[in-house]
Amino acid sequence: MKIIATNKKAFSDYIILETYEAGIELRGTEVKSLRESGANFKDSFCRIKNGEVFLLNLNIPQYRNGSLNNHDPERPRRLLLHKKEIHRLLGKVKEQGLTIIPTKIYFNNRGLVKVEIAVAKGKKKYDKREDIKKREINRRIREYLKG
């Protein structure tokens, strides 16, 4: 498994409740661009529309060697999930405060592009501060035990 990009901000801004692996519908130049330069998760999220899951605002830069038929960098991309998973996601999103966010995009062992999406709940400011305090305490304990 070769990781292309991870959404580091998702882990600091959200509490991850459940993760799913989804295929993603891409054009040829998008796959080439992912192999070459990666992707940007800034402000990306998932929406369920007409029984299909779409990944919005994922920026895959245009392929450098592409022609006029190059792709739009921020076009909506369909995620490939089983119907049962889509219904489960729909039920979770209808709960108050839950959202679907992408956490990782990678090539699996067979060379296919996969996206790891997560059902998450947004953190409040005090939750973020608490996490920072815990990390700082753990770091100090490790330093103290080390010597």
Swiss-Prot record:
Keyword RNA-binding among UniProt keywords: yes
GO terms (BP aspect): trans-translation
One example GO MF annotation: RNA binding
Compartments, record wording: Cytoplasm
Main location, first listed in the record: cytoplasm
Cellular component GO terms held in the UniProt record: cytosol
Superkingdom to which the source organism belongs: Bacteria
Pfam families the UniProt entry points to: SmpB
Entry keyword annotation includes Transcription regulation: no
Role noted for this protein: Required for rescue of stalled ribosomes mediated by trans-translation. Binds to transfer-messenger RNA (tmRNA), required for stable association of tmRNA with ribosomes. tmRNA and SmpB together mimic tRNA shape, replacing the anticodon stem-loop with SmpB. tmRNA is encoded by the ssrA gene; the 2 termini fold to resemble tRNA(Ala) and it encodes a 'tag peptide', a short internal open reading frame. During trans-translation Ala-aminoacylated tmRNA acts like a tRNA, entering the A-site of stalled ribosomes, displacing the stalled mRNA.
Protein name as catalogued: SsrA-binding protein
Organism listed in the record: Thermosipho melanesiensis (strain DSM 12029 / CIP 104789 / BI429)
